[in-house]
């Protein structure tokens, strides 16, 4: 059984390890690289998980019955006056050994529940690597629809990958 909860500063070591592994294994899925993120001190990761009333980011973690962090995703909230109605889903990762078991769905569901609990939010946006059909289908199940493709969005090695931009209207049922 998987449990999803908001991560806190004390979860920073396991969250950092999960994300660094994801950056290394799936360089096309993330804009950050393992080199740049591994150089950040643990305090940076703890700050990302800070629990504050007006936090600019919230990160959710999925835990196995044994207490192992097997997935994570985050919501980033716009602070600029004209864009406060938007949030960004970011950093979605599920360990390969836990995929196709509902972990990703539970994480997206938790993030959208948090977004819907905020009366000023109207939409959530995300990007997914073009060609990652399983991830795109997961997001579509929760009401996300594509609205554009960003060519050459992320440099990977000598090449580039495109990102599909998607959005979810929180006003829809």
Cite the ranges covered by each PLM segment.
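C-terminal "cap" of GNAT-fold acetyltransferases
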Residues: 120-173
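Active-site acidic-Proline motif in GNAT/NAT acetyltransferases
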Residues: 95-97, 101, 130-131
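Acetyl-CoA-dependent GNAT
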Residues: 9-10, 16-17, 22-91, 95-97, ...
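Residues that form or flank phosphate/diphosphate-binding pockets in enzymes
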Residues: 14, 84, 102, 134
């Amino acid at each position: 059984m998987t449990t999803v909860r908001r991560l806190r500063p004390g979860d920073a070591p396991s969250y950092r390890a999960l994300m660094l592994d994801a950056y290394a294994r799936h360089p096309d899925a993330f804009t950050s690289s393992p080199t740049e993120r591994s150089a950040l001190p643990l305090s940076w990761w703890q700050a990302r998980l800070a629990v504050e009333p007006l936090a600019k980011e919230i990160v959710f973690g999925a835990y196995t019955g044994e207490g192992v962090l097997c997935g994570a995703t985050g919501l980033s909230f716009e602070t600029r006056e004209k864009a406060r109605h938007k949030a960004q889903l970011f950093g979605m990762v599920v360990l390969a050994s836990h995929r196709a078991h509902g972990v990703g769905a539970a994480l997206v569901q938790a993030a959208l529940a948090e977004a819907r609990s905020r009366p000023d939010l109207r939409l959530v946006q995300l990007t997914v690597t073009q060609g990652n059909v399983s991830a795109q289908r997961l997001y579509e199940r929760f009401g996300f629809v594509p609205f554009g493709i960003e060519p050459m969005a992320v440099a990977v090695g000598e090449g580039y990958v495109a990102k599909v931009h998607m959005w979810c209207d929180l006003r829809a049922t």
